[in-house]
């Protein structure tokens, strides 16, 4: 791990320690005063300023107590951005949230943070209570306001894979993959192992999964060894957004692909069909 990458990794670990200590002041020290946004893309919670984010932490943190935690299980960092696998325990927001987060830094401070997670196992009552109404749901995740600062090797791999996904071209996608690639769809609870089986799986689903046909690339975060790309699904899914995490080998080939999005927003019959497509 390069020194600058290790430094960002350490900063994020310190952030989660402060958040899990329920310390509003220490948590906010990690954010730039002119931050762009902190957004939960699943619930449509948008905090577009330092003051707005500080206010929501001040509202919730005094009610948290052990064993409530927010922690990272994997961090794929570059020098100025990262993809974070993270968990919010049920004591925080009423259910276990397994999140992929895109995080951008400027001068060592967080300027943009977007959480993506699948709500299908989350309590329906809480989901309906917390989710922003459709008419007010934010569609702009401010990716255009923050320049991509990901490693060139990651940008190359992410762009090639997303273009193949958008064209529903499984063979082109396979060209970017290591022979032992693992593909995970967190929303569909699907895992496929190996390039051969992954290619066959993609042939079956790229025309229908949100990250597939007609999807658009929005933003890339991470470093030489991995990160992720944010995307918007094609017109058939009403602007559903998601993220795909990537891990790379020394040659720039993709060794792991992990996608997440809110599958509660997909037609139930269509979701069942996609789940069934994991069977050869």
Describe each model-derived feature in a short phrase:
Residues 1-29, 33, 123-167, 171-175, ...:
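Short, low-complexity N-terminal intrinsically disordered segments enriched in polar/charged residues
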Residues 1, 8, 22, 27-28, ...:
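Intrinsic structural disorder
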Residues 21-80, 170-224:
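A solvent-exposed, acidic/Ser-Thr-rich amphipathic alpha-helical stretch
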Residues 4, 55-153, 206-214, 218-280:
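A beta-strand edge to alpha-helix "cap/lid" segment located at domain peripheries
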């Amino acid at each position: 791990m390069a020194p600058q990458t290790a430094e960002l990794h350490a900063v994020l670990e310190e952030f989660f320690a402060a958040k899990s200590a329920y310390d509003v002041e220490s948590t906010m020290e990690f954010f730039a005063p002119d931050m762009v946004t902190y957004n939960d893309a699943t619930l449509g919670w948008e905090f577009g300023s330092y003051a707005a984010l500080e206010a929501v932490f001040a509202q919730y943190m005094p009610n948290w107590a052990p064993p409530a935690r927010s922690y990272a299980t994997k961090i794929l960092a570059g020098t100025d951005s990262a993809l974070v696998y993270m968990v919010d325990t049920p004591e925080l927001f009423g259910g276990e949230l397994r999140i992929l987060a895109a995080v951008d830094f400027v001068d060592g401070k967080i300027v943009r943070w977007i959480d993506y997670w699948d709500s299908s196992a989350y309590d329906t009552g809480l989901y309906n209570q917390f989710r922003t109404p459709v008419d007010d749901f934010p569609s702009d995740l401010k990716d255009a306001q923050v320049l991509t600062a990901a490693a060139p090797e990651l940008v190359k791999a992410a762009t090639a894979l997303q273009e193949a996904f958008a064209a529903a071209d499984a063979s082109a996608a396979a060209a970017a993959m290591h022979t032992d690639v693992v593909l995970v769809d967190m929303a569909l609870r699907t895992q496929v192992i190996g390039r051969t089986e992954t290619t066959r799986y993609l042939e079956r689903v790229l025309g229908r999964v949100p990250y597939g046909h007609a999807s658009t690339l929005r933003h890339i975060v991470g470093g030489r060894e991995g990160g992720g790309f944010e995307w918007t699904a094609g017109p058939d899914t009403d602007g559903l957004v998601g993220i795909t995490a990537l891990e790379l080998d020394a040659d720039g080939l993709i060794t792991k692909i992990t996608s997440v999005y809110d599958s509660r927003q997909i037609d139930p019959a269509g979701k069942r069909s996609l789940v069934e497509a994991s069977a050869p």
